């Protein structure tokens, strides 16, 4: 990715997290986010459709990075699900301040949906036969 694009993405996300830590999602405007990120509104809209699209992208990114941090060096199976659960819990504790900001207010309930999506991806990558098996596909 182009360095300028990376810097712009980082500025947008940092500005959003700063605002989200102080305000409800519905109260954040593109105008104030752009002022804080030192970008034009057209630049923001080149990256995201609206504030809600940015929020959705950050939610998925946060949960994905939590899962990536625990699956990087260890092989999980259904037989050692207790180890996976413990590691997942510890990863969430380590990232709790970011998770609290991104999933605060009305968005708190979306954390479960994002978790379910990532767990399905993880299980189906290891056990693809479970995806279409009604008895095994408990998610």
Regions found by a protein language model. Give the residues of each.
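Helix-turn-helix
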Residues: 19-52
């Amino acid at each position: 990715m182009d360095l300028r694009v990376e810097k712009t993405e980082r500025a947008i996300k940092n500005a959003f997290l700063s605002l989200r830590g102080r305000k409800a999602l519905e109260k954040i405007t593109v105008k104030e986010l752009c002022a804080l990120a030192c970008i034009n509104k057209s630049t923001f809209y080149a990256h995201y459709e609206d504030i809600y699209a940015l929020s959705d992208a950050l939610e998925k990114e946060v949960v994905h990075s939590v899962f990536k941090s625990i699956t990087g060096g260890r092989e999980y199976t259904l037989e050692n699900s207790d180890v996976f659960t413990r590691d997942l819990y510890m990863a969430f504790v380590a990232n709790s301040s970011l998770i609290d900001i991104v999933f605060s207010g009305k968005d708190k309930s979306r954390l479960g949906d994002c978790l379910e999506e990532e767990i399905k991806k993880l299980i189906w990558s290891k056990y693809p036969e479970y995806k279409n098996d009604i008895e095994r596909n408990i998610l």
